[in-house]
């Protein structure tokens, strides 16, 4: 990451990604965009047991949607499901325990889900940031396994289910941190470079943006989007970035503020009217590059990413 890119991004973050940035942006929101009732619509939210995923799942439930929570750990997931049911009065909240860094588990879940359920909206919210290089049981670098390969398998596996329904959507929670990274397909699992968990996470988030753009091109019947929730005060941030949280805690967005654009992309007709494949921040499509610091990738590089992911995905099927 260049010094220029780092400085520009950090200044942008302080201006736009904080609580005050949200409070400024929301002045332009259309209030009735989220005044919708959605009985019969089916949503799948990964990482829906805490943070902005849980906040999004709760708001969907309050509006009558059926919600499938895909979570890793049984006990906190059960607690979250119970809380969502109590607060929303909606019983149509279902729980699936899946480790999204385990491709074999994801494939098994996808095959079972396809047989038993319909789906209108997939929300790839779950994320992983480990700060020391760890390998999964399958020998995959953990951040890459959960943030990139896991998202790839889950999304491509569920595309046939989504394509059967009216107004299908896929929302992937990326991060503004991806602005400091250019797509790098030469070391996807951090085998040849010093490991920096924050930068690996940012690279994964760049990969998600590229995948979203490519899926939008290949599957025009589905509305794809990626988004940045801003800097939100969530359990994940507190655990993965304790220093950052300690420094900026009082300036961070609430979980509801961080979830707002995710919810807007999932529910509003205004979001569906936007071109597919875009990257959103505070209900607006924004550039995927910093000014004077483009991180664009070639079609060949993007195709290489997809080829590697597809080969890995099939290995574990």
Swiss-Prot record:
Keyword Oxidoreductase carried by entry: yes
Tagged with keyword Transferase: no
Binding site for NAD(+): 50, 52, 201, 205, 234
InterPro entries: NAD(P)-bd_dom_sf, SDR_fam, SDR_member_12
Xref: Gene3D superfamilies: NAD(P)-binding Rossmann-like Domain (3.40.50.720)
EC number: 1.1.-.-
Species assigned in the record: Homo sapiens
Protein name in UniProt: Dehydrogenase/reductase SDR family member 12
Alphabetically ordered keywords of this record: NAD, NADP, Oxidoreductase
Biological role stated in the UniProt entry: Putative oxidoreductase.
